[in-house]
Each structure stands twice: as structure tokens, then as C-alpha cells.
Amino acid sequence: MEIIKEKTVAITGSHTTEILSGRNDTNLLNVLFTETYLLIASLYQQGFKTFLCGMSDGFETIVAEAVLRFQKEKADIELVTVQPNSEIERDEYLLANSSLLICYCDHHDKDAMRIFERAKKGGMPTTNLHTLLTDYFANDSPAKQALQSYNNIDGFSYCKEGILLCYLYGEKPIIAPFENIEQVEQRDDKLYVTLTNELEVDAYILSE
């Protein structure tokens, strides 16, 4: 398969244990998946159609799953798995064959930070989703805390601002911010969220 560098995104990031380390947040992986999916949709609109990604547990797996889900919307988006013999070879391949780097890492993850810093030093545009979640990490609202008990649901998605009610490709996501959530209540096998405008949304609570 021919890789067009100008339309290709490289992916790297932390393992699941590193993502969750030091954070008491059962919805963080859900939020990260949503934000990754929205970013992929945005990049696709900009002409990026190929994503180079390893298959390590954690952010790389999240990206792979998000690309495959988005493939149901746009069949011409491609996921290319990268499995070189060493991390150095992986870094070289990713940087040589892409024009944008997407990652999730902080200063504790030396491996992911290594390629992130190399990309920036080389002038490659980069996006670190860890930085994009700064406000989410700082949010300690009652609504965010109340939703922590429900990390496996079907009906809406968690995002960095609150809950994503609806998203159609090419349109602005419909989001209910945490500050607009008035009540969170479980009734039988469903979760009901009441907003400050008295609108009520619900989701099924799935078994583990």
C-alpha cells in the first residue's frame, strides 16, 4: 500500500496503566475515546486519511478502535499497524512517513515523550490529547463525580466538557456540559440525566 505522507497521521501514546496512574476517574478512558474519535473526524475533514499506529495496550489501541469505528462513516480512511523490531525503528518509521503526530502522554512516559519531542523539534505539527484534557482533569463538579459510577453505558458518550448527546459527521457535536447537569439518577437498568433546561436524557446501564 502506498502511503501519502501529506495525508498520514502518526500515533503514539501511553499504556493504559500509565493513563490511569494517579487518577481516580472511571470514565477517563471513555472520555479519551470520544475525544480521539472527534479528532479523527476533524482530521479526516482536513484530508488526513491514513493513520499509522502500533497496537500497544492503551492510547494506540484506543486510536485503532476509533479509526475502525469511523470507517463505518467513511470507508476510505485507513489504519496501518506498525510493528517494527525496536522502538527506535518505530519512531523513525512514524516520523518519516507522516506529516502530523497525535499522542497522549505526559512527562512520566519517557518513550512516548521521546518521539513527541523529536517531532516538535523537527517542525512536525503535533497534538497531545493529554494537554487537551487539562480542564477535564481540573473539573471536580458534582455532576462529573455522580457519573463516575456509570462507566459502561449505551445511549450517550462521555467527553471532556460533559456528555456528548449526538454527533453527526460534518456537524457540530451536541454536548451537555457538566455545569448544565442538574441531576443524575439510576432507575432500574437505565441512567437518567436531567439538565438545567429540564431536558432529560437517558442511557442503558450495561453489565460488565
Residue ranges and their predicted role:
Residues 79, 173-175:
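Tryptophan-centered short beta-strand motifs
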Residues 7, 161-163, 189:
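Beta-strand-connecting loop/turn residues
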Residues 2-143:
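Acidic/glycine-enriched connector segments
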Residues 147-170:
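Conserved beta-hairpin
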Residues 145-152, 172-173, 180-208:
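Acidic, Ser/Thr- and proline-rich intrinsically disordered linker/docking segments
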Residues 103, 163-167, 193:
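Short hydrophobic/aromatic-rich beta-strand segments that constitute the beta-sheet cores
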Residues 4, 157-160, 186:
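Generic beta-strand structural signal
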